[in-house]
């Protein structure tokens, strides 16, 4: 249940990204992102998920670096952007935020949750069981740490600097697509906007694999009636049908998003 709520945050982010880039309304974006996810996740399988995760990870790294450099250049350098932020509100660059809401306990718990707690999330734990050997596991720790640092540090820094470069942005969930379209030519914007879409798809891949497995194998196939009636060639059809129904459910949940996506993820 909670994972379905978390997945709805990915739908919201994907729909807002498509709305900003393609000029469509939010609800149309929800439908489009649902169709994309059906083809990427439902009919892909585990091997396809792992391959796409790797490709999308590379897209995220290069796009983060390109956008960070472009925002700094567009804003006239770090010093100029910093001065703009201070002119808006001197408290923006303090550890406690513009209105003092970022208390030490909130920030520390946030980073423990995001930085350490994710290791225990089921969809992450499943991927950790798929390493070929110990050598692959050790290599992934090093590579993963570098990748996470680049993406997490880069995207958060872009978000802060965007306030100094484009202070009129009100929809904070749409910051990345808005500034991308403003600071980059269309061909680079297309590449960079593939990064948040890649992040959305990789997250949904892992979460959906877990939900599908838990719902179908642990719940539905544990009942005697379904176990007896769904056999042979009926099993793949049944699995695909349940997966599509889950996606449709999440699609309807996402039609009325919260004010900020992070609230759903933290919940």
PLM feature spans:
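Flexible loop residues that form catalytic
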Residues: 34, 54, 63
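Helix-loop-helix junctions that connect adjacent transmembrane helices in secondary transporters/permeases
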Residues: 1-43, 127-265
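Cytoplasmic-side transmembrane-helix entry/capping segments in multi-pass membrane proteins
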Residues: 54-60, 237-240, 267
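Loop-to-helix junctions at membrane interfaces in multi-pass transport proteins
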Residues: 58-189
């Amino acid at each position: 249940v909670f994972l379905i709520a978390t997945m709805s945050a990915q739908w919201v982010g994907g729909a807002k990204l498509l709305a900003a880039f393609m000029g469509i309304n939010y609800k149309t974006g929800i439908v489009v992102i649902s169709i994309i996810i059906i083809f990427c996740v439902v009919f892909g399988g585990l091997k396809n998920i792992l391959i796409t995760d790797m490709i999308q990870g590379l897209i995220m790294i290069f796009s983060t670096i390109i956008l960070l450099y472009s925002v700094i250049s567009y804003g006239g350098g770090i010093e100029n952007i910093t001065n703009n932020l201070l002119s808006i509100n001197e408290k923006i660059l303090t550890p406690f935020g513009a209105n003092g809401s970022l208390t030490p306990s909130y920030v520390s718990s946030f980073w423990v949750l995001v930085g350490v707690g994710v290791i225990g999330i089921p969809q992450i734990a499943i991927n950790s069981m798929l390493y070929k050997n110990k050598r692959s596991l050790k290599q992934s720790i090093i590579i993963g740490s570098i990748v996470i640092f680049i993406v997490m540090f880069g995207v958060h820094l872009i978000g802060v600097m965007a306030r100094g470069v484009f202070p009129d942005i009100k929809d904070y969930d749409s910051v990345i697509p808005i500034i991308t379209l403003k600071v980059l030519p269309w061909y680079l914007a297309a590449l960079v906007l593939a990064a948040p879409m890649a992040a959305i798809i990789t997250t949904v891949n892992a979460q959906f694999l877990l939900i599908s497995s838990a719902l179908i194998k642990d719940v539905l196939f544990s009942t005697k009636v379904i176990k007896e009636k769904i056999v042979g060639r009926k099993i793949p059809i049944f699995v695909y049908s349940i997966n599509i129904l889950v996606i449709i459910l999440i699609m309807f949940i996402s039609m009325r998003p919260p004010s900020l996506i992070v609230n759903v993820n933290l919940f």
